[in-house]
Amino acid sequence: MSDENQHGFYRTSFEYASISWRRMIPNVADTIVVTLIGATALQVASNVLITILTLNIAFLNFCSLICMHNLKRGAKADVFAAIVRAACMMIGVYLALIAVSVATLEGAPRTQTIAFIALSALRPFVAGWNAYCAEVFFAQGKRQIVRSVITRSSLIYAGVNLLFVGLSHFAGTQNSIISLLIGVYLALFHNALAYARILPTEWRFSRQDLKDVFSLRKLDLVGIGAGLSASFINMLEMGFLALVGWVVAAKFPQIAVFYFPFFTLVELTSGLAIGLGRSVTERLITPRPFPRLHVLIAVYSTYSLLCFLIYVGLIGVSNRDIFALPLSLAGLALLFLICDGLQLVVRGYTLAKADGGKLTHLSAIAYLASGVILALAAVLGSVQALAIALVLGPLFLAISIPAVQSRTALNALPNR
C-alpha cells in the first residue's frame, strides 16, 4: 500500500472519528438528562426511554449502510424509499410500545411515557433525511461539511436540554416532556435545513422525485442484510450494557463508581474504532486499498492503552484505587476497552458485504453467552463473573469475525 493511500486512509478515519466524538456530545447530555429525570421525578419509564434511544441508533446505522452500498450506484429514489419505509416501521414499534405502556403502567408514569413516545414519532423521518444528506457528502469526500453541521447541532442539543432540565431542577419544578424534546428537534431540524440548503442539485428531491419514491414497489438495493446486521448488533450491545448497568447498580454498588465513568472512556475510545471500521467498509465497497488488519489492530490497541492510562491517572487523582478491586478489574477493563474497539474495526469487513456476512449469528452467540454469565453473576454476587460477562461478548467478536472470514476476503485489497 502506497504512503499516499495509507495517509489518505488514516486521514479519512480520523475525520470520521472526529465526527463520532462530536456526536457523543448529545450522549453525554442524555446521560445527565436521564440522571436529572430521576432527580426531578419526571416519570418516563426507563425501559421505554432506553428502547427508543437504542432504536434511534440502530435506525441510523441501517440508513448509513444502505446509503454506503447504494448511493454510488445512483439509486437515489430506492435509497430514500428504503429510509422512509424503515422510519414507518419505527412508528409501528412506537405503537407497540404505547400498547405495552397502556397495559403495564398506571397513573402519571403511563401518561408521561405515552406522551414521550408520541412526541418522538417525527424523529425517525427527520433523522432519516439527515442521514441521507450526510452520506451524500461523505460519498463526495466533503466530510468537513458534516463535521461542521453536527458540531453545531450537538451543541444546540446539549445546551437546550441542559438549560431546560437545569432550570427545572434548580427551580424545584417538574420537567415537561416537551422541554426534554425541544433540544432534540431543534438539533434535528437545524441539520435538516442546513443540509437541504447546500445539498447538490442532483441529490435533491423534486415533487416528481417524491412521487417516484412513494410509487416504488420493489426496491433495487444491495446491502439490506448489512444494514439489518448493523442494527441488530447495536440493539444487542445497548440492551446488554443497559442490563449490566442495572445489575451493577443493584448488586455491586462498590464498583458502580468505577463502572459508569468507565463507559464515558469507552465512548471516547470507540470513536476512533468507528472511524477505522467505516473507512475499511468504504474502501472495500469502492474498492480502494487500506492497511492490513494487524496494522489496524496495533494502531487502535496503542490508542486504547494511552486512553486507559489517562483514565487510571484520573482515578488516582480522585484518591480511588482501581487496582484494589477483585481480580484486578483494571486489567479486565483494559481488555474490554481494546476488544470492544477491535470488534468495531473488524466489523467493517463484514458490513462491506451486501448480506453483512455472519455478523448477526456471531453477535447472537456472543451476547447470549454473556447474558447467561451475567445472570449467574447477579445470582452469585460474583464480581469476577460480572467482569467475564462484560468482556466475553467483545472478545468473542474480535476473535471470531476475522476467523470466519476467508484470508482472501480480509486481504483482498491491500497491496502485496
Swiss-Prot record:
Coarse class of the protein's main subcellular location: membrane
Annotated signal peptide: none
Presence of the UniProt keyword Cell membrane in the record: yes
Membrane topology: Multi-pass membrane protein
Subcellular location, record wording: Cell membrane
Chain segments annotated as transmembrane: 24-44, 48-68, 79-99, 114-134, 153-173, 176-196, 230-250, 255-275, 295-315, 322-342, 372-392
Keywords for this protein: Cell membrane, Membrane, Transmembrane, Transmembrane helix
GO CC field: plasma membrane
Keyword RNA-binding: no
Function: The actions of the proteins TfxB, TfxD and TfxF are implicated in the processing of the inactive trifolitoxin (TfxA) precursor into the active peptide.
Stated name of the protein: Trifolitoxin-processing protein TfxD
Native source species: Rhizobium leguminosarum bv. trifolii
